[in-house]
């Protein structure tokens, strides 16, 4: 199979898992091409070493926005718009090629990558750990209603 892989991961366990998965697919003689925005960490276990083709797509960032982003520990809305624009471009590149499937990993900033909105090929979105904020929101909501989020049993 001809497989396109997309990720915007930081270094860590998810990146290690992806690295080993790509290595495994290559051992099975699949063609694996990797597409990443410049915000992805490729210093830790670089996929360039284990894939057929590797492409980095630049995400526009000015030095001022980079400093502000570092101070705030997160990207601004403008940074996210630039990231979305880059991921849309990557999706278009993949859509124009003859891939059988696209394997998509999480995004380090928005969890579900913007690329998912634009990809037209059959795809697999691997989401090993969903963002847990929704659980906290539910617990707060239940507290305000005077209910506990835990199941209760009635004694008879």
Which stretches of residues belong to each language-model region?
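Extreme N-terminal starter segment of soluble prokaryotic enzymes
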Residues: 1-3
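A short, glycine/small-residue-rich beta-strand->loop->alpha-helix junction that serves as a flexible
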Residues: 5-19
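N-terminal strand-loop element at the rim of the active site
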Residues: 8-11, 24-76
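Short, solvent-exposed loop/turn segments at secondary-structure junctions
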Residues: 10-12, 39-41, 107-110, 129-132
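Short aromatic-enriched loop/helix-cap "lid" or pocket-rim segments at secondary-structure transitions
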Residues: 17, 44-48, 66-71, 115-116, ...
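An amphipathic, basic-hydrophobic alpha-helix
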Residues: 65-111
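Active-site proximal beta-strand in glycosyltransferases
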Residues: 101-103, 117-154
């Amino acid at each position: 199979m001809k497989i396109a892989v997309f990720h915007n991961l930081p270094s860590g366990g998810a990146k290690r898992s992806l690295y080993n998965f790509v290595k495994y697919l290559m051992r099975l003689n699949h063609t694996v091409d990797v597409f990443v925005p410049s915000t992805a960490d490729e210093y830790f276990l670089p996929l360039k070493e284990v894939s057929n083709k590797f492409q980095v797509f630049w995400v526009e960032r000015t030095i001022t926005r980079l400093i502000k982003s570092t101070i705030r520990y997160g990207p601004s809305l403008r940074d996210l718009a630039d990231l979305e624009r880059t991921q849309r471009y990557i999706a278009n590149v993949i859509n124009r090629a003859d891939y059988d499937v696209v394997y998509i990993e999480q995004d380090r900033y928005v969890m579900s990558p913007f690329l998912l909105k634009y990809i037209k090929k059959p795809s697999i979105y691997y989401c090993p750990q969903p963002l847990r904020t929704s659980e906290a929101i539910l617990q707060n909501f239940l507290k305000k209603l005077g209910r506990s989020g835990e199941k209760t049993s009635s004694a008879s």
